[in-house]
């Protein structure tokens, strides 16, 4: 689950919201990663993995019947042997419903930074862990709609014993490229 505070810079107003987000890790060789590579004119052999993200949410200013449900897939192509930076392939962007390529990098605090430039706008996101079951995310969008958001995302585990083990270990044993 995700709690979000979005700041609309043009209107000088803030809006609260919540989302339910599902992140599924995609391993090298997954047919869905091959599709992403083809759509972005990249070699599938270069993709090391990725994820499929689905979400459903609501914002305070929503009108009746307005929906914030969607999904996207990501594929990662590292730029060097460390794997800490490289090309981020999406089957479609947030702003445009066409395949888009951006960049990913891990910063010195192991935060994941995603940057994507679109025709009329650009986005910058940073993800990091504040605890074994708490991920934080900031994002800014510049261009047609200038806004900034901060999200607290709480991992929901199906198995209570796994939740206790993850909490006592301090961090999950294996993190997917986009967390959890």
Predicted feature locations:
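Soluble ligand-binding/transfer domains with enclosed cavities or grooves
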Residues: 2-180
């Amino acid at each position: 689950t995700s709690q979000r505070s979005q700041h609309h810079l043009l209107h000088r107003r803030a809006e609260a919201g919540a989302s339910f987000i599902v992140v599924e890790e995609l391993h090298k060789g997954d047919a869905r990663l091959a599709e992403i590579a083809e759509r972005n004119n990249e070699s599938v052999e270069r993709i090391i993995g990725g994820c499929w993200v689905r979400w459903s949410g609501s914002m305070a200013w929503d009108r009746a019947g307005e929906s914030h449900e969607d999904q996207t897939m990501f594929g990662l192509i590292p730029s060097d042997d460390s794997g800490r930076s490289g090309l981020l392939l999406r089957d479609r962007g947030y702003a445009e419903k066409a395949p888009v390529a951006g960049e990913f990098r891990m910063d010195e605090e192991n935060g994941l930074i995603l940057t994507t430039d679109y025709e009329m706008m650009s986005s910058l996101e940073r993800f990091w862990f504040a605890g074994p079951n708490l991920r934080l995310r900031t994002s800014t969008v510049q261009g047609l709609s200038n806004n900034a958001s901060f999200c607290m995302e709480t991992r929901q585990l199906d198995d209570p014993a796994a939740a206790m083990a993850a909490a006592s270990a301090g961090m999950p044993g294996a993190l997917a490229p986009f967390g959890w």
